[in-house]
Swiss-Prot record:
Record-linked SUPFAM superfamilies: Nucleic acid-binding proteins, Translation proteins SH3-like domain
Source organism (scientific name): Rickettsia bellii (strain OSU 85-389)
GO biological process, one term: peptide biosynthetic process
HAMAP family: EF_P
Protein name: Elongation factor P
Pfam families: EFP, EFP_N, Elong-fact-P_C
Annotated GO MF terms: translation elongation factor activity
UniProt family annotation: Belongs to the elongation factor P family.
CDD domains on file: S1_EF-P_repeat_1
Lineage: Bacteria, Pseudomonadati, Pseudomonadota, Alphaproteobacteria, Rickettsiales
NCBIfam families: efp, PRK00529.1
Amino acid sequence: MKISANSIRTGNILVYNNDLWVVSKQPEHTQPGKGGAYVQVEMKNLKTGTKRNERFSSSDHLEKAELEQKDYQFLYFEDNNIVLMDNQTFEQISVNKEILDEKLPFLTENMIVKVEFYNEKPLSIELPATVILEIIETDPVIKGATATASYKPATLANGVKVKVPQYLEIGEKIVVKTEDLTYVERSK
């Protein structure tokens, strides 16, 4: 699907020079005093990971990749891959672990994830917005430390370290955002 350069947004996946590029930063729309308006776009190649700044005229049209999104259930790890199952067809697919990068520790058994496909090839895996995890290591509670909003480091059951409020103890379950690895609330 063709979109105008003015319609490009962060997160869009574009087909440019026969490669897939994700827009990594909000495009800058510029209208100089002399000459035509243009859009400065910072994008990252999905295959190689290289970043590139490109300038497009406001009148340019680019190909936006049409992605298909499906829900899959995480089953298990196999060598360097993640094995997922489509809950409608029970078809299993194997995807390289690198697709998740630093979010890999948040993947838990039977978790439902969204997989984005381009030309029937998996491009990305989107985890749920939040996960519930147990604190396995943190400093003890200090009496009177709840007067100010201060945070202390805590290690979660998956090995990830996050900052949590002073009043939380080892063994408590908390809700964590998978997007930026931040504490949300105590689990209910």
